[in-house]
């Protein structure tokens, strides 16, 4: 009994730095942000600690509400395309032999060795009118005149896909790698076609990984304002851009905090939906 008690005491002491770190750098900033969202802005960068709901009411104004709608549209479009591209990559990556899996993981992680901003500036060279993409398309005879892709909505979607696609691939890969392929083989032996076996077995069992990838791509794509700034030419204003603008030029920290709180609530709701769906799937599997 004494040994068990000593072990539990030592474990508690070892976890103490983690608790302190979480409280100081996560809990306290969140409390401050939520409190700030109910404060009243004053001139300059000042804040008057007077309770108000105006910051949240302002979000419902057409100009700000439209920003949320546009951000949701962009996030939804980007996530669908990323899922359609990322799922097959993650699935086939899990089917590779062990020595090739490591090479594939290395190639997938390679872009993270370079800063995202630098990589996005590379896309400016590719997407501009005299860029590589238009050059290749014209040489192949697919187009006669160069396309105006840069500083447009499609350019932002391309940037989102480029930055966030690895997260989807790794999420699907981690889920597909744990899949017991004997279930698929059993379905095939019982007369199911490859397509039927995929939708009834593979897709259902890898759904948690797909949903995890959706969360890892949908939520950031609403706030990655630097992609919209670089590839979109400020034609699309995201929630992240709005928060940055209110924190700097707008000098309205309480309103920026309110926007951040709404984003945090949206993220929490998505995670709760994900957990509910995955738990339901696990219960179905047990049943």
Residue locations for each model-derived region?
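Membrane-water interface segments at the C-terminal ends of transmembrane alpha-helices
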Residues: 7-42, 57-146, 150-177, 201-225, ...
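Glycine/proline-centered hinge or cleavage motifs at structural transition points of membrane proteins
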Residues: 190-191, 204
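Short cytosolic juxtamembrane segments of multi-pass membrane proteins
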Residues: 276-287
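Glycine-rich helix-loop "coupling/hinge" segments at transmembrane-helix boundaries
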Residues: 45-50, 125, 225-251, 287
């Amino acid at each position: 009994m004494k040994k068990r008690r000593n072990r539990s005491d030592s474990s508690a002491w070892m976890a103490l730095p983690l608790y302190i770190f979480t409280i100081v750098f996560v809990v306290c900033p969140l409390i401050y942000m939520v409190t700030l969202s109910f404060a009243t802005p004053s001139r300059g960068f000042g804040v008057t600690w007077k309770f108000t709901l105006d910051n949240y009411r302002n979000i419902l104004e057409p100009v700000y509400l439209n920003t949320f709608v546009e951000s949701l549209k962009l996030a939804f479009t980007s996530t669908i395309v990323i899922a359609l591209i990322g799922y097959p990559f993650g699935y086939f990556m899990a089917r590779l032999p062990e020595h090739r899996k490591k090479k594939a993981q290395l190639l997938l992680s390679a872009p993270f060795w370079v800063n995202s901003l630098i990589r996005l500036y590379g896309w400016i060279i590719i997407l501009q009118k005299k860029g590589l993409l238009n050059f290749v398309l014209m040489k192949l005879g697919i187009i006669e005149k160069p396309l105006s892709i840069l500083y447009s909505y499609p350019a932002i979607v391309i940037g989102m896909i480029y930055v966030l696609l690895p997260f989807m691939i790794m999420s699907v890969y981690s889920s597909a790698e744990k899949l017991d392929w004997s279930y698929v083989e059993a379905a095939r032996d019982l007369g199911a076609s490859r397509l039927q076996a995929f939708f009834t077995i593979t897709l259902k069992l890898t759904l948690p990984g797909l949903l995890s990838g959706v969360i890892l791509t949908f939520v950031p794509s609403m706030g990655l304002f630097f992609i919209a700034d670089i590839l979109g030419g400020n034609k699309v204003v995201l929630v992240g851009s709005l928060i940055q603008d209110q924190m700097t030029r707008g000098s309205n920290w309480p309103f920026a905090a309110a926007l951040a709180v709404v984003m945090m609530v949206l993220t929490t709701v998505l995670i709760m939906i994900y957990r509910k769906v995955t738990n339901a799937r696990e219960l179905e599997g047990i049943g």
